[in-house]
Regions:
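Binding-site signature for planar aromatic cofactors or substrates
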Residues: 1-155
Length: 155
């Protein structure tokens, strides 16, 4: 799957986000351990912030083709900023690694959307800086983007 949903929680609040990338962006490290890159996001770090306080996560992988099985994963996540972890994921700010239990699930009720168009926002080798998402152009956001944000001083 080129995307998955991840639920994380801290302080009584559950947060669900979508994570996406090119095919293979989620890597199997070894039996029972997967990892994925965290790219430039909205600087809220909700998933990463929750993981730093509570490592328990739930992931849902699915293809909207009407036939592929869903994959549910429950596990404990850790955040890795080391060079070795990051170099395996082009464009990553850091890597999230998950010790997991995997539960295959039937494709019943999954719609067939069959539109396979890659996101222009995923960093790709040789493609330069991805376009800025609309929200980074908002006046109240522009000035508070991180210093190293590639879209901070673009017009």
């Amino acid at each position: 799957s080129k995307f998955f949903f991840i639920a994380s929680a801290w302080n009584g609040y559950i947060d669900c986000n979508i994570k996406s990338g090119d095919a293979g962006f989620v890597k199997i490290v070894e039996k029972g351990i997967i990892e994925y890159p965290e790219y430039d996001g909205n600087s809220m770090y909700r998933t990463a912030g929750n993981i730093s306080k509570n490592p328990n996560v739930a992931l849902l992988f699915l293809n909207f083709d009407g036939k592929s099985r869903r994959i549910r994963i429950n596990g404990q996540a850790t955040i890795h900023h080391d060079k070795k972890s990051i170099e395996d994921h082009f464009g990553a700010k850091f890597v999230v690694r998950i010790n997991c239990e995997i539960y295959p699930n039937c494709p019943r009720y999954i719609p067939n959307l069959e539109k396979d168009e890659p996101s222009a926002y995923v960093p790709r080798k040789g493609k330069g800086i991805p376009p800025a998402p609309e929200w980074k152009e908002r006046d109240y956001i522009k000035n508070i983007l991180p210093k190293d944000d590639p879209h901070k001083n673009r017009n």
